[in-house]
Amino acid sequence: MRPALVAVAHGSRDPRSAATISSLLDRVRSLRPDLDIRLAFLDLCTPRLETVLTTVSRAVVVPLLLGRAFHADVDLPGAVARAVAARPELDITVADVLGPDARLEAVALRRLAEVGVSTADSGFGVVLAAAGSRQAPSNAAVSAVAHRLSQHTRWQVVPAFACAARPTVSDAIATLQAQGAHRIAVASWFLAPGLLPDKVVRQACGTALLAAPLGADAAVAELILHRYDGTNQGRVARDRCRPESITAYRQAHDRRAGAPGRAVRDCHHHAGLPR
């Protein structure tokens, strides 16, 4: 029997977020009706990951995160480690996060096309809006996505962040206008609607076309299954989820955050699932 697929989202106080994630998981189930697929959350919503892991004996945990930061490096392995400590017989593998990935970038381009932004229109300047993190490598990954989008279109593309990093969306819009962009569009590097995507909308101040979050797209559903299947081909280290690993995870995070002995959280959440 194949292990269950446990898709874990961050969780949000905004009900639109959980509704979107639930719709996304329905898409995944439609693609693989024979697979046991379950949804869990790290925070703010139920069921929590540790609760869901009490109901399975074997599972692949797929983080519904668009990049690596505090939630992927500390919160998630901590929750899994606690579940394994409580039930040592659990056979749990943690898959890689969803992004960055070319399939997500293609969805972001489609969302822009839906609001009338043509890849051939050099008059557009595009802001790629993401959550933001106190971890520089996470923000650099978003910047790399923006660079790839600019390479495959005729746009100027700059990254922007809703919190914890700069430039802000407002600053990015001003930069594009100063560089000669005649029209502005904002691409969403969020998986679902929520408070931080709403902050992006406010910062755009009615001056830009606003693309929707990636959402319950078929390509995102296929990517979730790709992450699940990848663990069965030996591409993901199993020791991520062992109880003794969590100390190493925290120490590594502390070093990256520049605060020895104390992990530093991102502002509200990270990588696409807003509170």
Kindly give the residue locations of the regions a language model identified:
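Active-site-proximal alpha-helix that buttresses catalytic centers in soluble enzyme cores
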Residues: 1-275
